Amino acid sequence: MLMPKRVKYRKTQRGRMKGNSGRGTDVSFGSFGLKAIEPAWITSRQIEAARVAMTRFMKRDGKIWIRIFPDKPVTKKPAETRMGSGKGSPEFWVAVVKPGRIMFEADGVPKEVATEAFRLAAKKLPIKTRFIVRPDYED
């Protein structure tokens, strides 16, 4: 599972997901992409589940790029703990995804295969997504 090797601060504030994604909105590595339409926190487990679903369907043909990285720690207090006494300890890592962000890219497979692979990957994610084809793509 994806997570940073080391971080400057162990705990971060939650923050807000306002507006659209400013960067990472174009298909730049592969020919096909999976674009987020809604804002959400995508956990490292969800990213891994989507990656596995795509790789299995593509039967290890072609190449997959993961364009998001879970670099935000989410803290949680233990069950049945009274309020107060500080912030909980980091439990898992999330990637903050805003609308318009390209999350996955693929290349080296036919368009139909990529479409189905991304459809399977999208089922593993908690947001609505759209299949994107690079503008200069030729069959």
Swiss-Prot record:
Gene Ontology BP annotations: translation
Q: Is Glycoprotein one of the keywords?
A: no
User: What are the record keywords, sorted?
Assistant: Ribonucleoprotein, Ribosomal protein, RNA-binding, rRNA-binding, tRNA-binding
Please give one Gene Ontology molecular function term for this protein: rRNA binding
Say which domain of life the source belongs to. Answer: Bacteria
Which SUPFAM superfamilies does the entry link to?
A: Ribosomal protein L16p/L10e (SSF54686)
Gene3D superfamilies found in the cross-reference section: Ribosomal protein L10e/L16
| Compositionally skewed regions (Basic residues) per UniProt | 1-17
| GO CC terms | cytosolic large ribosomal subunit
* Positions of region (Disordered): 1-24
The entry assigns this protein to a family as follows:
Belongs to the universal ribosomal protein uL16 family.
The role this protein plays is:
Binds 23S rRNA and is also seen to make contacts with the A and possibly P site tRNAs.
List the HAMAP family hit by this protein, alphabetically: Ribosomal_uL16
State how it assembles: Part of the 50S ribosomal subunit.
Q: What is this protein called?
A: Large ribosomal subunit protein uL16
| Organism expressing this protein natively | Pelodictyon phaeoclathratiforme (strain DSM 5477 / BU-1)
What gene is behind this protein?
rplP
